[in-house]
Regions:
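Conserved hydrophobic "DFG−1" position in protein kinase catalytic cores
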Residues: 7, 38, 47, 111-112, ...
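Nudix hydrolase/Nudix homology domain
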Residues: 57-58, 69, 96-163
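The catalytic Nudix box helix
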Residues: 46-47, 62-95
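A short local loop/turn or secondary-structure capping micro-motif enriched for an aromatic residue
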Residues: 23-26, 54-57, 129
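Acidic, metal-coordinating catalytic segment for phosphate/diphosphate chemistry
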Residues: 1-35, 41
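A glycine-rich, hydrophobic loop/mini-helix early in the fold
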Residues: 33-64
């Protein structure tokens, strides 16, 4: 199924048009995506390992993805979590952390404080091949070892003190 994204300008004003995922953007066009950081009662973060055939394959990241045309970022976050790790969350559980503007997209980053048992997680094997809970120090070590997607690492360093 093809995905379509709403197009925004540099000020995140909707431009009353959509683009098919994979089609080229014009200068000054942006789309919106979301990312969710799960933190359990031990303070550990849930990360997933990207499928080897994807861009940055084998590296670790937080769950997230593109916001489909007509969706809010909260709706997209709930959908992406269900699709990628099989966990049901509610919009009310999302704590907005930050809006990050990068290259040609805006990323809304959410925090969810939730204990999720390993047996509750069902990975979309086309997207992710593994998951684990890591402490912030373990995540920092993984970043130093270049095991984490670079843009994810940058956002983590920018926001880690808010957790």
């Amino acid at each position: 199924m093809e995905e379509y994204w709403d197009i925004y300008d540099a000020n995140r004003m909707f431009q009353n048009r959509t683009i098919r995922r994979g089609d080229p953007f014009q200068d000054g066009e942006y789309y919106v995506c979301c990312e969710v950081w799960f933190q359990n009662s031990k303070g550990e973060m849930l990360i997933t390992q990207r499928h080897p055939n994807k861009k940055a394959g084998g590296l670790w990241e937080f769950t997230g993805g593109g916001v489909l045309a007509g969706e809010t970022t909260a709706q997209a976050t709930v959908r992406e979590v269900k699709e990628e790790i099989g966990v049901d969350i509610k919009e009310a559980e999302l704590i907005f952390l930050y809006e990050h503007k990068q290259r040609n997209y805006f990323m809304d980053i959410y925090l969810v404080r939730k204990d999720i048992a390993p047996e509750e997680i069902v990975l979309d094997k086309n997207e992710t091949v593994d998951f684990k809970w890591v402490s912030k120090d373990e995540l920092r070590a993984m970043i130093e070892n270049q095991e984490v997607v670079r843009s994810v690492a940058e956002r983590f360093y920018m926001l880690a003190d808010k957790l």
